[in-house]
Amino acid sequence: MVNALTNNKWESIPKENLQLGAETFAYETGLYETFRTLNHHPVFLEPHLDRLFNSAKLTQLKIEYTQQEIWEMIQEIIEKSPNPNQRVRILAVPKKLILYTSSLELNNLIYKGVSVITVQTNRVHPEIKTTDYRTCLTAWKSANDSRCFEAILIDKNGILFEGSRSNIFWIINKKLFTRKKDVLPGITRQTIINRSSFPVEFGILKKSGISKIDECFLTNSGSGIIPVTHFNGEKIGNGSVGEITNQLLKQY
């Protein structure tokens, strides 16, 4: 059971009812946000709430609470947990707002470089974090079955968009690139775009062009920057974390 704050009241919810993409998930229509805490402090909470409310407008989902009220609820659930570093989930579904936390356990080996694969899939409303997570979950399971950290979603033309749980950046000739549109406006992604000491350009990368990139990394709110050293079984660069990626890791 998960101890959750539902419409500002505590209740216990079966864990399987909160697992996005699972057949047991209880809320097919809705939105979600996930962010982390660092020493009991929420990281980038404001942009996460901004994105939640913007998505609610786009999907015409009514959220009964203000951002300030949600912020206060989040403070309550964070303080209730003994873990200083937590993963916080917001579920906004018809007539309900559900907040809960879980312990954030990161494997530091990922920062030495991970392997990813490409998975072709049809993507619907990628710019919105909806609770209809089945497409991304299926892609992620393909990666997991291949003993890879992440699945990079591509279309029928072999164009890369983003990961099932992340955004993607690549580096060619010391220039930093990412997709401009048709991807989730990730919070960590936007932080890199806004604050990186390296200028970011928007571009398109095809599966056939992966062998030509020098470096690659993923971003998400839980893990931050994750270097990619192998793509579809092939090395990126020399197969180790690249110079620019290393500098960004230190800055982040």
Language-model features: where?
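Helix-start/capping segments and mature chain N-termini
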Residues: M1-E76, V93-Y252
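Ordered, amphipathic secondary-structure segments that act as subunit-interaction surfaces
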Residues: K80-P94, I98
